[in-house]
Amino acid sequence: MDQIVIRGGVPLHGAIPIAGAKNACLTLMPATLLSDEPLTLTNAPRLSDIATMTALLRSLGAEVSTLQDGKVLALSSHRIDNHTAEYDIVRKMRASILVLGPMLARDGHAVVSLPGGCAIGARPVDLHLKGLEALGADLTLTDGYVHAKAPGGLKGAVFEFPFVSVGATENILMAATLAKGTTVLKNAAREPEIVDLARCLRKMGAQIEGEGTSRITVQGVDRLHGATHPVVTDRIELGTYMLAPAITGGEVELIGGRLDLVAAFAERLAAAGVDVSETAHGLTVKRANGRVGAVDVVTEPFPGFPTDLQAQMMALLCTADGVSVLEERIFENRFMHAPELIRMGARIDVHGGTATVTGVPQLKGAPVMATDLRASVSLILAALAAEGETVVSRVYHLDRGYERVEEKLSACGAQIERVKET
């Protein structure tokens, strides 16, 4: 098993290219199941989660080819000969549930195991199922599998999400494109990844209005055709690397970065004393003067502060001058990185969904263990600023969502390497 070794205290200087969004690509890939014509995705990230989704789609009968060193995905679902997404694949990744809506909409039946992924709270799929039932699906849950049927096809309906859910919005949006009549999704998620999905589906012939707002309207069509679509920039990878020069000092340009994707996050960085400016090729980030200042953070659905940047922001605030309060409103049990940061000398007090962080003058290197995807990279950020050597174990979490992180950081001067665990 791999470990990442970091020797901290080096200010970063250079440029980091930002990949296509993992969360967008994992939604776009199942969209191939809606059509019997090819779908080509460019600017795809090279991640283990993408490989998992590739394996899942192939198990259903889809063809998936990787081109240009994995940056282009060529998908074709002209023949779907298996409508069961097995537990052995689905358990590895929560996004696997996104094959349910497309298969059900196109062929009228699907069987999908309940998914896995990061161990962050309950993260139920209830809203996916309730939304599909609103479109006329007959669903039963047996032995950990969702059995879905719609022999007469799905039918448009008005469905209001009781709370905002990105995954459920994506699943039901895809299913609605082939439903008979009009579907209206109220209190829909507004994330850029949903906007990206809607744009791709529209290229495939779907009739969609309102993406990026809380009300999405879909007029169902008889069939969708093929398309070519670039995956939107990964705003979580972007935000993560924006924190690298903020926590170490120095100045880094983030190629392909877009401020509109991370506006709420950038505002909190600016409040802490970090300079963020737009360039011809992306964004430049540098720490303004001395230590960053303490700021309070509340995670919210887009366009608010992303929950997927909470752990990384905590790493920065461990080095801030003063006391910060982070309130996690999206997921329960999402402070599992705090005990590991404490091993590095951080002062963090967690009560329920709130963490109080008192900044310390200097973090210290230590052996630490990643508990989930975002926690793993928060430990790497902390290690970049720490005195001495830090060894991060269980970095397989990292490879699910970050493309060649050690290469990108070392190109900016970080002393970081991947080694085999001894």
UniProtKB/Swiss-Prot annotation:
Catalytic activity: phosphoenolpyruvate + UDP-N-acetyl-alpha-D-glucosamine = UDP-N-acetyl-3-O-(1-carboxyvinyl)-alpha-D-glucosamine + phosphate
Keywords: Cell cycle, Cell division, Cell shape, Cell wall biogenesis/degradation, Cytoplasm, Peptidoglycan synthesis, Pyruvate, Transferase
One MF term in the entry's GO annotations: UDP-N-acetylglucosamine 1-carboxyvinyltransferase activity
Family (UniProt): Belongs to the EPSP synthase family. MurA subfamily.
NCBIfam families reported in the protein's UniProt record: murA (TIGR01072), PRK09369.1 (NF006873)
Residues at the active site: C118
Gene3D superfamilies: Enolpyruvate transferase domain
SUPFAM superfamilies reported for this sequence: EPT/RTPC-like
GO cellular-component term (any): cytoplasm
EC number(s) given by UniProt: 2.5.1.7
Residues annotated to bind phosphoenolpyruvate: K22, N23
Pathway(s) this gene product operates in, as recorded in its UniProt entry: Cell wall biogenesis; peptidoglycan biosynthesis
Residue positions where 2-(S-cysteinyl)pyruvic acid O-phosphothioketal is found in the record: C118
Record's protein name: UDP-N-acetylglucosamine 1-carboxyvinyltransferase
GO BP terms, alphabetized: cell division; cell wall organization; peptidoglycan biosynthetic process; regulation of cell shape; UDP-N-acetylgalactosamine biosynthetic process
Role, per record: Cell wall formation. Adds enolpyruvyl to UDP-N-acetylglucosamine.
Signal peptide positions (record): none
Top EC class for this record: transferase
Gene source species: Dinoroseobacter shibae (strain DSM 16493 / NCIMB 14021 / DFL 12)
Subcellular location: Cytoplasm
